[in-house]
Amino acid sequence: MDFSFSFMQGIMGNTIQQPPQLIDSANIRQEDAFDNNSDIAEDGGQTPYEATLQQGFQYPATTEDLPPLTNGYPSSISVYETQTKYQSYNQYPNGSANGFGAVRNFSPTDYYHSEIPNTRPHEILEKPSPPQPPPPPSVPQTVIPKKTGSPEIKLKITKTIQNGRELFESSLCGDLLNEVQASEHTKSKHESRKEKRKKSNKHDSSRSEERKSHKIPKLEPEEQNRPNERVDTVSEKPREEPVLKEEAPVQPILSSVPTTEVSTGVKFQVGDLVWSKVGTYPWWPCMVSSDPQLEVHTKINTRGAREYHVQFFSNQPERAWVHEKRVREYKGHKQYEELLAEATKQASNHSEKQKIRKPRPQRERAQWDIGIAHAEKALKMTREERIEQYTFIYIDKQPEEALSQAKKSVASKTEVKKTRRPRSVLNTQPEQTNAGEVASSLSSTEIRRHSQRRHTSAEEEEPPPVKIAWKTAAARKSLPASITMHKGSLDLQKCNMSPVVKIEQVFALQNATGDGKFIDQFVYSTKGIGNKTEISVRGQDRLIISTPNQRNEKPTQSVSSPEATSGSTGSVEKKQQRRSIRTRSESEKSTEVVPKKKIKKEQVETVPQATVKTGLQKGASEISDSCKPLKKRSRASTDVEMTSSAYRDTSDSDSRGLSDLQVGFGKQVDSPSATADADVSDVQSMDSSLSRRGTGMSKKDTVCQICESSGDSLIPCEGECCKHFHLECLGLASLPDSKFICMECKTGQHPCFSCKVSGKDVKRCSVGACGKFYHEACVRKFPTAIFESKGFRCPQHCCSACSMEKDIHKASKGRMMRCLRCPVAYHSGDACIAAGSMLVSSYILICSNHSKRSSNSSAVNVGFCFVCARGLIVQDHSDPMFSSYAYKSHYLLNESNRAELMKLPMIPSSSASKKKCEKGGRLLCCESCPASFHPECLSIEMPEGCWNCNDCKAGKKLHYKQIVWVKLGNYRWWPAEICNPRSVPLNIQGLKHDLGDFPVFFFGSHDYYWVHQGRVFPYVEGDKSFAEGQTSINKTFKKALEEAAKRFQELKAQRESKEALEIEKNSRKPPPYKHIKANKVIGKVQIQVADLSEIPRCNCKPADENPCGLESECLNRMLQYECHPQVCPAGDRCQNQCFTKRLYPDAEIIKTERRGWGLRTKRSIKKGEFVNEYVGELIDEEECRLRIKRAHENSVTNFYMLTVTKDRIIDAGPKGNYSRFMNHSCNPNCETQKWTVNGDVRVGLFALCDIPAGMELTFNYNLDCLGNGRTECHCGADNCSGFLGVRPKSACASTNEEKAKNAKLKQKRRKIKTEPKQMHEDYCFQCGDGGELVMCDKKDCPKAYHLLCLNLTQPPYGKWECPWHQCDECSSAAVSFCEFCPHSFCKDHEKGALVPSALEGRLCCSEHDPMAPVSPEYWSKIKCKWESQDHGEEVKE
C-alpha cells in the first residue's frame, strides 16, 4: 500500500521556460576548423573534393538544369515532417557555434540536406509524385552562400538523378557542389561583410519574403498582405506555396519521421554528459540533446567542422550548438581541474593563464554549482533515464501573440497595456492532462534590438523577437529579492492566477474576437506523448517596453550562465526562443486523474518594467484538509536538489528574507531572464507584496486608518494621532480650507490601541511620530513596553520576536514593521516576522493574530502530552513563562498505529530528567496550536472553557525557514519547512488562503500547501528517532525525515554563523549608550542651585604659584567644595574648578580579557588628581528598584548605578560618559569622592596613586548584595574577595589565612608495610628464552614475549593484552588456560582441550605430555623477578 506523501499533482511543477536567447559563439574562432571559403581553391589549386569527381560529370549552368528531385524522390513526398509537438514552430534553426548559422543563407531544409544529407534514410515510393509547378523566370547563376547572410535563395541542394538512380552515392554530394562553386568565388571576407552592411535594408525585407515562402501553413488573407511582418509560428493546415514576384521558386519543405544519425565521426550521442566551453565562461556541464528544429544532435557547419547540440545544466534552461573541439566527455566534477590545467598549458602568455585561473564571480559560481549538482545526479543514471528526466520540451507562441506584443512595444514604449483575463476551469478528461502554464515575463533589456533596422519602404520597423522567460520553484529560490521589486511601485497589487480552460472555451473566445485583440492571451502546445493535449492560458496585464536608442547601451544586469550573454548585441538573425519544459515526471505517466477544485477569481496588477505571466502549473489542484488517498493521486516528481543547499540556498544567506528590501536596484543579478522573473503573489501574502517594493519609498508610511489601504490622496491629521485618511472614507468631497483635524483629536476621546475603548484617561506614547494612545493598565501588560520618567514607549517600538530572547537592546533597535491593528511590531526579516502576516505597505502589516478562523480551521491537537509523553522532558515549573516545552521531542502518532506507537518507549534526552506519568489520561488542548498537556504535568487544575498554552499567551509565533511538523487531512504528522510566500511557485501563491495562513514545503514528496498555526508545531533535533525501527513507515516518509534532519542542520548552521558574526560585530564596539556631559534629572529628583552668597570663599591669592591646586592649602579643596569663578579670589587662575571646566585626562575605551569593556588612561596621572566625573540619570530609590526589577526580567547583568544619597542615585546605564566603563577592583587606583559644586552634590573620581600612561582605571564599587546571589570578581588583585559586594581582605586576615594554609600541608606521616608485588617474568612465555621482551598490560598477568614469537616487527601501540587471554578457536575472552604455553580456550571450546598434568595438577594442552609437561632444562631457564615497595615509604595519615 503506497502511503507516499503528495498533496497535489505537479505542484512543484517541472515547467520551465527557455531563456530568450541562445549561445551563438560566432566570435569563437576555431583555428583548426576547415573553412571552405579560404581553401586552396582560391589559390588556383585543386580542392580535395575535386579529385573524387567521376569522369564525365559537368556542372549545370543554372539550377533550372537540375530536375526538381531531392535525394532521388519527388518533392511532394513528405520525407521530413515536423513532429507533432513541434508543429507550432517556425522553421528557423538556432544558428551554429561558429557564427555561420544556416538561417543566414539557407532554408532549414536546404541547410539540412546540404550539410548532412545522409541522415535521412531512403524511403520506398508508394505513389507517383504530383506534377511540379511551372518554373518561374530564370534566375542568375548560382553562387556559393556567403557569410554575409544574403536574403535571396541562391542555391538548391539536390542530387542528380540519371535513369532513376542517384549519380553519386557519397554522403558529401551536397557539399561537392558547394566546394566547386566556392572555387569560383573570389570575394574576400572583408568585402562580403562590407556588402552585407550596405544591403542590410534589403536583407530585412527580402528575409521576411524568404521566410514566408518557406512556411507550410496557410496564412490568413490579412497576413498574406503583410510581406514585411515576421511570421513566427506554423499553423497546422498545410497550404500551397504562393509565387512571389521577382523571387526564385522554392521547393516545399521535405519532411520525414526523425531517425537516428548514422554519419561517421560522431563521438557523442543523445543523452551523453559532456563538458562544453563557450566564450569566456568556464567549462560547463551539459547533456547532448536533439535540436528541436533540425531533430539532430550533430551537424557539419559551414566550415566543415562538426558541432554538437547541447543543453546546459543550470537553473536557466539554455541550449546551443558547440564545436566538437570545445566538447569533452563528462566524468565527474573533479575533471574540471584537469580541463583548467589543459587550457593553461595551451595559453600563449602569462596573462591568459592568469585569466583562466581567475576565480569565477559569485553569481556565476552559484549557477555553475547548480549545474554540477544536476550533472552529478544525471551521471548516476543510464542514458535513457537522462533523456527521460532532463530533455527539454519546447513550446512556442502563436504568431498573433508575438505580433501583437511587438506592435505594442513599438507603438508605446512606456504606456501600460492592460488586458483582462477570462476565468474558467478546465474539467479534465480521462485521456487528457492539464499542462501547467509556464509563467513568462518580458524585460526591457531583453527585448532590445541590436541595431536600428529600417525597411527600404516607409513601413514600420520589423517587430523584435519576443523573449519568454521561465520559472521553476528551484530557480526562483536562487533569485535575489531585488529582482522582484520595483522602485516607485506604491500601489497594492494582487495576484491573479489563471486557471486552465477548456479547449472549447478557448476556440469560442478566439472566434468571438475577429480583430485579434484577445488571441494573444492563449497559447496552444501539443506534446507528442500519447493522446495528451496540453492547453494553457497566458494573460498580460501591464507591459512597459523600453527600447534603447543606442546600440552600445549596456544592460543593467549581468549574466551567470554561458548562454545568456552570447548574441546579446544580436544580429538580424536573432530568433525567438522557445520556452522549455522539463520532461514529464513519473506522475504524468499515471492514467489516474485528480479532480480539480475551482480557484477563487482575483484581479491582478503586475509590476512596471516586467510582464508577469501567471497560471496553474502542471496538474495543480487545490485540496482541502480531508485529502484524497495517496494512492489515488500522482505526485509531482521534482529534483532531489530542491532539498540540497546547492539548490535551495544559492543566493544570499537569507535569500527569502524581507531584509532584501535594502538591496539596491542597480545591483547585478544572476541572469537576464531573472530580470523578468518578478514574483507576483496574493495581496494576502505579506512577503510577496513586500518583494515588489523598492528602497525609494518614503520611510513614513501613509495608510488610511479606515479602509487600511495605501494611496497618494491621503490627508494627514494635524492633531496628536498622526493618522491618515482618504477623502472618500471621511465622506468629504474636497480638502478642507484649514488644517484637518480628525474627530478623535477634536473631542480628545482617543481609543486605546490595545483594548479599543475610548476615553480621556488614555496616555499617548512618548515617541513623537507614534500617535498611539493606551490605558496605563493595558500597556503594562506588554513586556515590550518601556516606561520612562516622561511617559512610556509603546510595544510598537520593540520587536516582539527578539523580546522573547530577553535581549532588549537587540529588540529595540533596527527597522520595525508595525501591525496596523494591535501593538505588535517585528524586525523586517524572516527571522522575526510571524508567518502568515499580511503586508499593507513596506513598514505596516497586519499580523497573524487577526486571522479569522472558520469552524473547519480549528487547531488539530496531538494525542500525547508535550511534557511527559512517555519519557519526554520535564520542565522547570518554577519559570512562569514555561516557554521551552514546544521545542522538546514529541511522538508522531498515526491514526492507524497510534496504539502500537504508544507502547514504544521514547528516547529521552540526556540533559533532562524523566517524569513518570501513567498512560492515557485527560489532555488539556491548546486552542491556538497543536500542543496538549496533562493538567498534572502543568501542576494546574483542568480549566473550563477555552485555554491557550503559555507560548501562545506570550505571543510566540512561527517564522519562515523553520522546520515544523504539519498535520494535513488524514495523513500523519509530516516534516515540512515554512516558506516565504514569494519563494513558492506561482500556482501555489494563487491557491486560496486567508490571513494567518502560510505555505509549507513538505519534505520527501516536495509538495506545497497553505496551512495555519493550528496544524503546525516546531521540529526539534532528534525527532527522526520516532520513525526508526517502524516497519509501517514507507520510503517517502523515511526520505522526508532524512531531508528534514539535513535541512534542520543547515538552518542551524546558518543561524549559528549569523549569531557568531553578530557577536563578533558587537565585540568591536561597546554596547550603545547616549553620551552626556552632565547629570540628567529623571522623575522627582531635583538639582540644587546655591546662591553666590552661600558659596564659601577660599584664602588663595592670584599671585600664588598654583592657586587652589593640589599642593595648596585651599580651604575649599580640603572641604571638597569647588570654587566658583565669581567668588574665588584667584579668579581665572583657580585650579579648583575641575567639575565645571571638565578637566579630564585623555582616556580610551578598551576591551579587557574577562571583565568586558574598560577605561585606560593615555597620560600619566598624579596622586589626588581629578580623573573624571561620574554622570548619568539622576533617579530616586523607587525608580532604581523598578529598573533593577526590569533588568532581572530581561536578564541584564550589568548595572551602572551609584548611590549619592538615599533619594539621589546616578544610573549611567542608558546615558553617561567615559566613567561608566571603569571596572571594579579590590585594589583600585581611583576612588569616588562627593563634592559640592555650586550647591549640588556631585561624584568625582580621583587618583589614589600615581598612575602611569596605558594603565586601566579602576575603582571599588562597594556594592551592597541584594539577596543571596553574588557576582564573581575577576579583578585579579592579591586581596581580591572573589565576589562583588564582599569587602576585600585586610593584610592581617591575609596573613592568618596563609598560615592556616601552610599548616594543612604539614601532615603527620607514618610508616606502613606493603605486600610484595610480583613483576613480569624475564623470559618469553612462548619459547622460554630471555632477552628483549614485550610485557602484557593486563592486570595480574606476568607474561612476556619476544616480538619474533608474536610475529611482530615492532612493539604494539597502547595498552596490549597477550594472546594468552584470547581463545585459540574464536579469539573471544578465554576462561581456561594452559599453564605451560600461551594456548587458552573460551567456555564453548574448553571441553577436552585441557587435562591435568602430573606437575601439581596444573592444566596443560595437547601439545604437552601430561606426565612430563616440561623438559628438565626448563627449570634452569626460569628466573622470576620479585620486587616489593620500599618498606620505608611514607604515606599520608
UniProtKB/Swiss-Prot annotation:
Spell out the Basic and acidic residues composition-biased ranges. 202-248, 583-595
Give the ZnF (PHD-type) ranges.
Answer: 701-748, 749-805, 862-955, 1321-1368
Intracellular or extracellular location(s): Nucleus; Chromosome
Q: Where is the SET domain?
A: 1145-1262
Q: Where is the composition biased (Pro residues)?
A: 128-139
Write out the GO biological process terms: methylation; positive regulation of DNA-templated transcription; regulation of DNA-templated transcription
Q: What reaction does this enzyme carry out catalytically?
A: L-lysyl(4)-[histone H3] + 2 S-adenosyl-L-methionine = N(6),N(6)-dimethyl-L-lysyl(4)-[histone H3] + 2 S-adenosyl-L-homocysteine + 2 H(+); L-lysyl(27)-[histone H3] + 2 S-adenosyl-L-methionine = N(6),N(6)-dimethyl-L-lysyl(27)-[histone H3] + 2 S-adenosyl-L-homocysteine + 2 H(+)
| Description of its domains | The KIKL motif recognizes and binds the NET domain of BRD3.
Domain (PWWP): give its ranges.
270-333, 960-1022
Q: What is this protein called?
A: Histone-lysine N-methyltransferase NSD3
Q: According to the UniProt entry, where does the motif KIKL sit in this chain?
A: 154-157
Q: How does it assemble?
A: Interacts with BRD4. Interacts (via KIKL motif) with BRD3 (via NET domain).
User: In the record, which positions carry Phosphoserine?
Assistant: 150, 457, 585, 587, 590, 655
**Modified positions (N6-acetyllysine) in chain numbering:** 790
Q: Where is the composition biased (Basic residues)?
A: 187-201
User: Its principal location?
Assistant: nucleus
Q: Where are the transmembrane segments?
A: none
Q: Where is this cross-link: Glycyl lysine isopeptide (Lys-Gly) (interchain with G-Cter in SUMO2)?
A: 218, 245, 413, 502, 532, 628, 1151
Name the protein family. Answer: Belongs to the class V-like SAM-binding methyltransferase superfamily. Histone-lysine methyltransferase family. SET2 subfamily.
Gene Ontology cellular component list: chromatin; nucleoplasm; nucleus
Which of the seven top EC classes does this enzyme belong to? Answer: transferase
Residue stretches in coiled coil: 1033-1069
